[in-house]
Design a protein with these regions (language model features):
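N-terminal helix-turn-helix DNA-binding core of bacterial DNA-binding proteins
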Residues: 11-53
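Basic, amphipathic "hinge/linker" alpha-helix immediately C-terminal to the N-terminal HTH DNA-binding motif
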Residues: 77-99
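Amphipathic alpha-helical dimerization/coiled-coil segments
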Residues: 2-3, 91-120
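Basic amphipathic alpha-helical segments that dock to polyanions
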Residues: 54-61
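A detector for short, charged/polar N-terminal pre-domain segments
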Residues: 1-15
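Beta-hairpin "wing" of winged helix-turn-helix
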Residues: 62-79, 87
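A short, glycine- and basic residue-enriched loop/turn
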Residues: 32-33, 46, 70-74, 83-85
Length: 120
């Protein structure tokens, strides 16, 4: 999916781990470990993004304009190093919404085919 800097078009299907990373950043900026923990929590442990995969994705997502590095919160205390914090960009929000809408259409299609019930 590497097309070049800021060439991402919302509506283009995202890799699953990109979608989960954007969801993790949708409500707050986070550092790498915080993103990993949020993805694990929001998926009930069914999706795990490994550190190498995360940082490669963050690099590519930054190049595409979906996320950007940002300052650590003022109250953030480190145990030594200086973790990088990331936030979702307006383009990232649009891409995340488009992907969520795409997933919703797939769920609706599965319900129409009686693969899924309407009530969870």
């Amino acid at each position: 999916m590497t097309r070049g800097k800021n060439s991402f078009t919302p509506g283009t299907p995202l890799p699953d781990h990109w979608f989960h990373i954007l969801l993790a950043l949708a409500d707050d900026k986070r550092h790498g470990l915080g993103i990993l923990q949020e993805v694990t929590e929001q998926t009930g442990g069914h999706i795990q993004v490994w550190p190498g995969m995360l940082y490669l994705a963050l690099k590519r997502m930054t190049d595409e304009g979906l996320v950007s590095e940002t300052e650590a919160p003022a109250d953030f205390v480190t145990g030594g190093g200086r973790p990088r914090f990331y936030r979702i960009t307006p383009l990232g929000v649009r891409a995340c919404k488009a992907e969520a809408d795409r997933h919703a259409r797939l769920v609706n299609a599965a319900r129409a085919k009686r693969i899924l019930r309407k009530d969870p």
